[in-house]
Amino acid sequence: MAQNLKDLAGRLPAGPRGMGTALKLLLGAGAVAYGVRESVFTVEGGHRAIFFNRIGGVQQDTILAEGLHFRIPWFQYPIIYDIRARPRKISSPTGSKDLQMVNISLRVLSRPNAQELPSMYQRLGLDYEERVLPSIVNEVLKSVVAKFNASQLITQRAQVSLLIRRELTERAKDFSLILDDVAITELSFSREYTAAVEAKQVAQQEAQRAQFLVEKAKQEQRQKIVQAEGEAEAAKMLGEALSKNPGYIKLRKIRAAQNISKTIATSQNRIYPTADNLVLNLQDESFTRGSDSLIKGKK
């Protein structure tokens, strides 16, 4: 810039009169360039701007969207807000309904309400997040968590999260903030309470295991009783059958011999069984008498 001015000064006509004219031209051009530069500004994507003038303060009816805009230099200057949602993690220790200490952390996705930027600037300025979010999050967390016992905070986590989100969203509206998402990222208790919960769970598991073993023993006992009753009934029926017809035992021997014969017939080894191998005592006269009586009984 300085070099360009030197070159321009070298080309000016000599003499006091020419020097004065050139100087006026330079000053006029510089003033015009400065005025144009100060009269134009750009609002980037995801931003909004409001005007502050030195006489009336913040202009409540002017909210500028993205793009190129004009202003009156010195008299007006823009205040630009980023209206994109930004995440913030906030942790707060609080107490449950049964007086247990709870460490809870929230991830809050917030953005300013673009339609209320002038009033937000008057109340909170540009650092609205630092002024508002930590205080209202702590307030809502203490209010909601105090409604639940420590165990309910675990078993009803979805309900707790929904209640926190609803109350926090309504509270943020008072400060021209919009909350796009509120989620519980961490929920922990004191070491003493955690140890007590773990001990309780172990005791419950042991009790359930003992109950299972008792039920299993009872079931096995019932099964043995049923089996013994069945065997006793079978023995009783067999005794009655033998007392009524002695040939019944001979028939059982014949059927056993048939089963043995079938097994031997399908075997690869060649075996020639005898009557003794087939559990048949054919030389016993009682066998013949019992068989005859069984046949006559059927007739």
Curated annotation (Swiss-Prot):
<dbReference type="GO" id="GO:0009986">
    <property type="term" value="C:cell surface"/>
</dbReference>
<dbReference type="GO" id="GO:0042113">
    <property type="term" value="P:B cell activation"/>
</dbReference>
<feature type="modified residue" description="N6-acetyllysine">
    <location>
        <position position="250"/>
    </location>
</feature>
<keyword id="KW-0675">Receptor</keyword>
<dbReference type="GO" id="GO:1904959">
    <property type="term" value="P:regulation of cytochrome-c oxidase activity"/>
</dbReference>
<feature type="coiled-coil region">
    <location>
        <begin position="190"/>
        <end position="238"/>
    </location>
</feature>
<comment type="similarity">
    <text>Belongs to the prohibitin family.</text>
</comment>
<dbReference type="InterPro" id="IPR000163">
    <property type="entry name" value="Prohibitin"/>
</dbReference>
<comment type="function">
    <text>In the mitochondria, together with PHB, forms large ring complexes (prohibitin complexes) in the inner mitochondrial membrane (IMM) and functions as a chaperone protein that stabilizes mitochondrial respiratory enzymes and maintains mitochondrial integrity in the IMM, which is required for mitochondrial morphogenesis, neuronal survival, and normal lifespan. The prohibitin complex, with DNAJC19, regulates cardiolipin remodeling and the protein turnover of OMA1 in a cardiolipin-binding manner. Also regulates cytochrome-c oxidase assembly (COX) and mitochondrial respiration.</text>
</comment>
<keyword id="KW-0539">Nucleus</keyword>
<keyword id="KW-0496">Mitochondrion</keyword>
<feature type="modified residue" description="N6-acetyllysine">
    <location>
        <position position="262"/>
    </location>
</feature>
<dbReference type="GO" id="GO:0046625">
    <property type="term" value="F:sphingolipid binding"/>
</dbReference>
<dbReference type="GO" id="GO:0005886">
    <property type="term" value="C:plasma membrane"/>
</dbReference>
<keyword id="KW-0999">Mitochondrion inner membrane</keyword>
<dbReference type="GO" id="GO:0000423">
    <property type="term" value="P:mitophagy"/>
</dbReference>
<feature type="region of interest" description="Necessary for transcriptional repression">
    <location>
        <begin position="19"/>
        <end position="49"/>
    </location>
</feature>
<dbReference type="GO" id="GO:1900208">
    <property type="term" value="P:regulation of cardiolipin metabolic process"/>
</dbReference>
<dbReference type="GO" id="GO:0035632">
    <property type="term" value="C:mitochondrial prohibitin complex"/>
</dbReference>
<keyword id="KW-0804">Transcription</keyword>
<feature type="modified residue" description="Phosphoserine">
    <location>
        <position position="151"/>
    </location>
</feature>
<dbReference type="InterPro" id="IPR036013">
    <property type="entry name" value="Band_7/SPFH_dom_sf"/>
</dbReference>
<keyword id="KW-0678">Repressor</keyword>
<comment type="subunit">
    <text>The mitochondrial prohibitin complex consists of two subunits (PHB1 and PHB2), assembled into a membrane-associated ring-shaped supercomplex of approximately 1 mDa. Interacts with ESR1, HDAC1 and HDAC5. Interacts with ZNF703. Interacts with STOML2. Interacts with ARFGEF3. Interacts with SPHK2. Interacts with COX4I1; the interaction associates PHB2 with COX. Interacts with MAP1LC3B (membrane-bound form LC3-II); the interaction is direct and upon mitochondrial depolarization and proteasome-dependent outer membrane rupture. Interacts with IGFBP6 (via C-terminal domain). Interacts with CLPB.</text>
</comment>
<dbReference type="GO" id="GO:0005743">
    <property type="term" value="C:mitochondrial inner membrane"/>
</dbReference>
<feature type="modified residue" description="Phosphotyrosine">
    <location>
        <position position="128"/>
    </location>
</feature>
<feature type="modified residue" description="N6-acetyllysine">
    <location>
        <position position="200"/>
    </location>
</feature>
<dbReference type="GO" id="GO:0016477">
    <property type="term" value="P:cell migration"/>
</dbReference>
<dbReference type="GO" id="GO:0098800">
    <property type="term" value="C:inner mitochondrial membrane protein complex"/>
</dbReference>
<keyword id="KW-0175">Coiled coil</keyword>
<dbReference type="GO" id="GO:0002639">
    <property type="term" value="P:positive regulation of immunoglobulin production"/>
</dbReference>
<keyword id="KW-1003">Cell membrane</keyword>
<keyword id="KW-0597">Phosphoprotein</keyword>
<keyword id="KW-0472">Membrane</keyword>
<feature type="region of interest" description="Necessary for transcriptional repression">
    <location>
        <begin position="150"/>
        <end position="174"/>
    </location>
</feature>
<keyword id="KW-0007">Acetylation</keyword>
<comment type="function">
    <text>Protein with pleiotropic attributes mediated in a cell-compartment- and tissue-specific manner, which include the plasma membrane-associated cell signaling functions, mitochondrial chaperone, and transcriptional co-regulator of transcription factors and sex steroid hormones in the nucleus.</text>
</comment>
<dbReference type="GO" id="GO:0032991">
    <property type="term" value="C:protein-containing complex"/>
</dbReference>
<keyword id="KW-0963">Cytoplasm</keyword>
<protein>
    <recommendedName>
        <fullName>Prohibitin-2</fullName>
    </recommendedName>
</protein>
<dbReference type="Pfam" id="PF01145">
    <property type="entry name" value="Band_7"/>
</dbReference>
<feature type="modified residue" description="N6-acetyllysine">
    <location>
        <position position="236"/>
    </location>
</feature>
